[in-house]
Amino acid sequence: GTDFINKGYEHVRYNYDFGNKRHFSFEAFQQAQFNGIQRIDFRHLTGAGLRWNVLENDSLKLWVGSLPMYEYEKLTTGIIERNFRQSSYVLFFVAFKKFEFQTINYYQPRLDYLSDFRFSSSNSIEFGVLSWLRFVTSLDLTYDSAPPAEVPDLVFTFRNAIKLEF
């Protein structure tokens, strides 16, 4: 038979806006994931901090955030790591009538060992074909400066999708 390598995650984020004039919001998040390629049996992240809405309107967004987070990671080898990391990110979004582009980039160094860091980038382009039909292509990259044994330091995913809007 064919062996498949599974991956999955869930992410929940809460934002509280302090008011339009300040352009700051408080956010808290938690995430759980597994990833056979990266040898992650279970990873749980939780954190909270501030986001600065540098620019935001219907067609343009630029957000910058920085949040300390706790990371629990159990590898498929049974090794368990518990670390505190700083999760800093930049999100950029631009939309035109039939085109959207979004990128969000995270830099996450371990607070006690700064040379152990992760960088991830999630990028998508969305084109309107018809008023109810869109084509989406996305590229996700993850770089780990200290990956587990036999795991590549750079992992990427490329996806194409059709989006129906009713």
Question: Over which residues does each language-model region extend?
Answer:
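Solvent-exposed loop/turn segments connecting transmembrane beta-strands
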Residues: 1-5, 34-42, 76-82, 110-118, ...
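Transmembrane beta-barrel domains of bacterial outer-membrane proteins
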Residues: 1-13, 28-37, 120-126, 138
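Membrane-embedded beta-strands of outer-membrane beta-barrel proteins
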Residues: 10-14, 48, 88-90, 121-123, ...
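Residue-level signature of outer-membrane beta-barrel architecture
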Residues: 16-18, 32, 52-54, 70, ...
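Repeated loop/turn-to-beta-strand initiation elements of outer-membrane beta-barrel proteins
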Residues: 19-26, 58-62, 93-101, 127, ...
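Transmembrane beta-barrel strands of outer-membrane/channel proteins
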Residues: 28-32, 48, 64-70, 103-109, ...
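Hydrophobic, well-structured mid-protein blocks that either form specific transmembrane helices
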Residues: 35-79
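Outer-membrane beta-barrel "beta-signal"
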Residues: 154-166
